[in-house]
Regions:
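Active-site metal-binding core of divalent-cation-utilizing nuclease and nuclease-like domains
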Residues: 37-87, 95, 125-138, 148-152
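Intrinsic disorder/low-complexity segments
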Residues: 1-16, 139-160
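A short, surface-exposed helix-loop junction/capping segment
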Residues: 24-34
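Conserved beta3 VAIK motif of the Hanks protein kinase fold
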Residues: 90
């Protein structure tokens, strides 16, 4: 299957997560509004866990994720900051800027666990920074998504 067809097929998969991703980012915005920026990651993690719970959103903090190779479950696990629902990985940062290694960490989690959606949230700036990604299993790649969960081509503004 070509990369274009594979990505198009996955767009429908990504779109079904639009509402829950919107709710998670909204909860993070609420936490950021109350706590402001510059605190340590564990503070934001705990506050976000409480906010998600208050919103009735199922989430697990520091959940061990199993890794897969082909159809085999590996013994190696990773701990994601959050798993929302059963398959959305949320990584929290509190940095002046998101760096390529922060994205790489999320992408590794998504690829090795075959999680369809990943959200990277940065509380370290005066305005909350969030990025949405989708995992394309056929090509084993993670793609940037816009707020409507459509694949988008990143530009310099998206990664500042």
């Amino acid at each position: 299957m070509s990369k274009v067809k594979s990505k198009t097929k996955n767009m429908k998969t990504f779109e079904k997560y639009e509402d829950i991703v919107f709710q998670v980012i909204g909860a993070a915005m609420h936490v950021h509004h109350i706590l402001n920026y510059g605190l340590s990651e564990p503070i934001y993690q705990e506050a976000l866990q409480l906010e998600l719970s208050d919103e009735g959103i199922k989430s697990e903090r520091e959940k061990a994720l199993h890794c897969f190779y082909k159809n085999y479950k590996l013994e190696k696990t990773y701990k994601a900051d959050f798993v929302v629902g059963d398959d959305i990985i949320v990584e929290i940062k509190s940095r002046a800027n998101l760096l390529p290694e922060h994205r790489a960490q999320l992408f590794n989690y998504m690829r090795l666990t075959q999680s369809p959606i990943g959200i990277l949230i940065n509380f370290g700036r005066s305005h909350l920074q969030s990025e949405r990604y989708g995992y394309v299993k056929d090509t084993n790649e993670c793609v940037l998504l816009d707020r409507y969960m459509h694949i988008k081509v990143p530009n310099s503004q998206d990664i500042l």
